[in-house]
């Protein structure tokens, strides 16, 4: 198995909808949340604001069932394809990326 580089503590983790490839959210994993994700098959992250682990959907029911886990060429960023149940964003939106800044460059 490929080793993920947790030497800086947290690893950016991009979550994609496995059904259509849409970007759902960006969160951070530490080594513990990564291993909990591997063990349970559901996403676990590290909350920088609360300084604790959190299981996506544990409160809301909007869970993320892991389908695939990828790493980038440096092994310090993760991309996880999931089956998303309900919205991914805490605002109730499907994706956390719904604020367009600029288009038509």
UniProtKB/Swiss-Prot annotation:
| Presence of keyword Metal-binding | yes
Protein's cellular compartments: Cytoplasm
- List, alphabetically, the Gene3D superfamilies matched: Phosphoribosyl-AMP cyclohydrolase
Provide the primary localization.
cytoplasm
Q: Which domain of life is it from?
A: Bacteria
What are its GO cellular component terms?
A: cytoplasm
Listed A to Z, the keywords are: Amino-acid biosynthesis, Cytoplasm, Histidine biosynthesis, Hydrolase, Magnesium, Metal-binding, Zinc
* Cofactor(s) needed: Mg(2+); Zn(2+)
Give the cofactor note. Binds 1 Mg(2+) ion per subunit. Binds 1 zinc ion per subunit.
What EC number(s) has UniProt assigned to this enzyme?
3.5.4.19
The residues listed in the UniProt record as binding Mg(2+), with positions renumbered to this chain, are: 72, 74, 76
Catalysed reaction(s) here are: 1-(5-phospho-beta-D-ribosyl)-5'-AMP + H2O = 1-(5-phospho-beta-D-ribosyl)-5-[(5-phospho-beta-D-ribosylamino)methylideneamino]imidazole-4-carboxamide
The record's top EC class is hydrolase
The positions annotated for binding Zn(2+) are 73, 89, 96
GO-annotated biological processes: L-histidine biosynthetic process
Sorted alphabetically, which InterPro entries does this protein's record hold?
PRA-CH, PRib_AMP_CycHydrolase_dom, PRib_AMP_CycHydrolase_sf
- What Gene Ontology terms describe what this protein does at the molecular function level? magnesium ion binding; phosphoribosyl-AMP cyclohydrolase activity; zinc ion binding
Q: In which pathway does it act?
A: Amino-acid biosynthesis; L-histidine biosynthesis; L-histidine from 5-phospho-alpha-D-ribose 1-diphosphate: step 3/9
Q: Entry's Pfam families?
A: PRA-CH
Self-association and partners: Homodimer.
Which PANTHER family does this chain map to? HISTIDINE BIOSYNTHESIS BIFUNCTIONAL PROTEIN, HISTIDINE BIOSYNTHESIS BIFUNCTIONAL PROTEIN HIS7
**What is the similarity comment for this entry?**
Belongs to the PRA-CH family.
Function according to Swiss-Prot or TrEMBL: Catalyzes the hydrolysis of the adenine ring of phosphoribosyl-AMP.
Q: What protein name is recorded for this chain?
A: Phosphoribosyl-AMP cyclohydrolase
Organism (species): Listeria monocytogenes serotype 4a (strain HCC23)
State the organism's lineage: Bacteria, Bacillati, Bacillota, Bacilli, Bacillales
């Amino acid at each position: 198995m490929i080793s993920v580089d947790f030497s800086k503590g947290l690893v950016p983790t991009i979550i994609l909808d496995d059904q259509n490839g849409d970007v759902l959210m960006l969160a951070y994993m530490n080594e513990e949340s990564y291993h909990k994700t591997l063990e349970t098959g559901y996403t676990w992250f590290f909350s920088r604001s609360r300084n604790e682990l959190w299981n996506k959907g544990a409160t809301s029911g909007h869970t993320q069932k892991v389908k695939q886990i990828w790493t980038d060429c440096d092994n310090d960023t993760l991309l996880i394809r999931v089956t998303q149940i309900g919205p991914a964003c805490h605002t109730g939106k499907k994706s956390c990326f719904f604020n367009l800044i600029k288009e038509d460059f």
